Amino acid sequence: MTLPTLTSPPPQTLRRRGRVVLSAVLAATLGITVVSVATDASAADALLSQGKPATASSVENATFPASAAVDGNTGTRWSSTFADPQWLQVDLGSTQSISQVVLNWEAAYASAFTIQTSANGSTWTNISPVTAGQNGLQTLNVTGSGRYVRMNGTTRATPYGYSLWEFQVFGGSGTDPSLPTSDTPDLGPNVRIFEPSTPASTIQSAVDQAFNAQLRSPTAQFGAQRHVFLFKPGTYGRVWANVGFYTTLAGLGLNPDDVTINGAVNVDSGWNYGDESNATQNFWRSMENLSIVPEGGTNRWAVSQAAPMRRVHIKGNLTLAPSNQDNGQGYSSGGYLADSVVDGVVSSGSQQQWYTRDSRIGRWDGGVWNMVYSGVQGAPANAFPNPPHTTLATTPVTREKPFLYVDSAGLYRVFVPALRRNSAGANWPNTAGTSIPMREFYVAKPGDSAARINSALAQGLNLFFTPGTYTLNDTIRVTRANTVVTGIGFPTLIPTGGVEALNVADVDGIKVSGLTFDAGTTNSPTLMSVGRAGVHTDHAVNPISLQDVFFRIGSSVQGKATTTLAVHSDDTIIDHIWAWRADHGGAPTGWAVNTGDTGLLVNGDDVLATGLFVEHYQKYEVIWNGNRGRTIFFQNEKPYDVPNQAAWIGPRGNGYAAYKVADNVTDHELWGGGSYAYFNVNPSVRVDRAFEVPNRSGVRLRSVLTVSLGDVGTIANVVNDVGGAVPNPAGNTTPRNVVAYP
C-alpha cells in the first residue's frame, strides 16, 4: 500500500489494561480522611481557544478542517496530509498568558512535536520541549504568552497525517466576570436552608406546604414544582417531613451524623391522585447525608423508582413498604439504598424489588421477587429464589456521589468521595476524597442557556444545577478531565430541535450526578452519551461515573429519543439510573406518540452498572456490546402499549428481550435481574425471552426472573430458551426463576 492511497484510520481500539495503583486506594484502605482543594490548572484559568479562528499547514480533505479542533465537539477533528512537518494554530485574538495546552489526539498522532507561541503569527517561540504524543488525551503544563498558539509536528507516529479531536489552550486572567462564582452561592428560590436555631414550627410549616400542595393532585407527578430542604449541622426538634414528587431533604454536614432530625422523613401511600392505594408511583424524591431518630422507632420510605436514599443513618428501624401493605393493594416497587447505616431492622414488606449497596444494617426482613445486596454488612445470606435474596460480599468498584456541605467557616463546598474497590459497608466517617470550594462551580439556574453553561465549562468551572427546568437548544459538552457536574432537587434538562442534551468526553474522572433528562418533542438520537464510539481508552484508575441520573421519554412533554444513554467509554461506573419510556404522563403517551428504542447502550469495555432500572422501551431495552461488563441488580418492565404482535417482531422472534448481550461478547456477568410483562393494550402479545445472551461459559447470569403482572401478557422464557413461561399455571403473578445460567 502506498501513501497516496491511505485515508485516516478508524478510531483507535487498543487498550492499556493498567489496574489498581496502590497510592490511589491506600487512604481509603486505611480509613484516612483526605481533604484537598482541586488544583487542576484549567480549574483556575480560562479555556481561550474554543471557537477561535484556526488554521493549519494542510488538511487531509474538507471533512477535517482546522476549525474542528477548536469547536468543543469531540466528535469532529482536524487531520493533515500524510507528510512531515505539519502544524495547527489558533488565533486567540489578543496576547494572553498561556498555562496549559490539552491535546486530544486521534489514532494518527505525533511522535515528536512542540508547542509554540507568537505575537504576530510569523516569529515563533517554543514553550514546550520536543514532546512525544500519545493516542488520546495529553495535557502539557507550560509557561508563555502570545496571541497565536500552535502545535508544530515534526515527526508522525503513523503513516497517516496528524489528527486532533481537540486542541485546547488555557490561560489568561481566569474566570469570566459575566459568570460569577461564590463560596456562599445563591441556590435559588426552590431551596430552603435551615439551621438548628430555626424553630421546628417554621420547618414543619415549610415541608407541609410543599407536600400538601401535591396531596391528591392530578398534575404534581409531572409538575414544575421543585423543593429542596437543606439542614446545616446540628440537632433538630420534632420534624415530620412527608416527601412528595421532586422533593429532596439533605444534610449539610461532612458526615451524616452532623445533622440529626428527630421525627421522620416519611414516604407512604394514600396521597397520589389516581393511585391512592399503593406506592408504585412514588418516584422522583430523595434523602441524603443526614441522620434520623424516628418517632416510634421506625422510619417509613415506601418508594419506587428514582427515589434514592444515600449516606443516611437511621437510628432505629426502616420500613420500605406503605402503611396499607396488608390491605390487598399496598405495594411499592423498586428502590435504592447506598452508603447508609440502619441500626435496627430493615423491613421490605410488600416492596417488590430493592437494591442495597455498601451499607451496614442490623437485619433485613422480607422479600417479594428480587432483593439484591452488594457490600452490605448484615445482609441476609444468598438464597435466591427462596427467599429471593442475592448477596455479594463486596461491590467491585464504587465512587460515592458528590455532596454539598458547609465547612467550619460557613463556606459551601462539594465533597467528591474517592474511588473504592471491593468495598463493603458505609464510606463514612473518615471518607477519603477531595473537597472543592463552590467558587470553582458555576451555579446554573433555570433559564440559563446551553451557551452560557458551555461558557462556564470552557473557562474550567464545574457545574452545579439548582432545581428547575432547563431548555437546551445545544448540547452541553463536558471535555475537561475530573469535571464535576451535579445537581440537587431533580433539575430537568430538556433538549429542543433533536439535539443531544449532554455529551461527556472520553477523558478521566468526569462525574455526573443528580440530573433528570426529559426527551423533547423532536426526536434526539441520544439524550446523553459518554465517550466516543469505537474509542477504547483505559480509565480503570480514574473512571467516569454516573449517579442518580434519570431519563424520561414522555412526561409533561411528548418526548422522543432513539437511545436515552449511550456509554462508549471503558470502565464507566453507572450507579443508579432509571431510564423510562413513560406508560403515563402529564402529556398523552402511546406506541406512536412517545417513541424510544433503547434505554441503555453500552459499547465500552469493563463497564459496571450497580442499580440499573430500564423500562418500557420499544426494542432491546439494554444492549451490551462491550466486554467484561457487570450488572448488579436490574429491574425492567416491558412496554405496556404494544398494539399487536405484528408490530413487535424482533430479530429473533416475538418481541425484544429486555437485556441483550451481543453475540460477540465473551465475558459478562449479571446478578439479580427481573423483567416483568403487562401487555394491557393487547394481552395476547408475547415476547420469546426476557434475557438474550450468547451461550458462552464467560457469560454468566445469576438470580434472574420473569413475572407477568396480573397474568397480563406472556414472556415465553427467562433466558434464551430456558426457564419456562409466565403466566405460570399457578397464576397470581408467580415468577419464573433461573438461579444460574449457564
Feature map (PLM): residue ranges:
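Disordered, acidic Ser/Thr/Pro-rich linker "stalks" and the adjacent N-terminal cap
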Residues: 30, 44-93, 104-109, 129-132, ...
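Short beta-strand elements bearing conserved aromatic residues within extracellular beta-rich modules
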Residues: 113-115
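Short beta-strand-plus-loop segments that form exposed binding edges in beta-rich domains
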Residues: 152-159
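Extracellular carbohydrate recognition and processing domains
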Residues: 125-142
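Secretory targeting and sorting signals
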Residues: 1-43
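Extracellular/periplasmic carbohydrate-active domains that bind, remodel
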Residues: 175-742
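A short beta-strand element within beta-rich, extracytoplasmic domains
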Residues: 96-107, 151
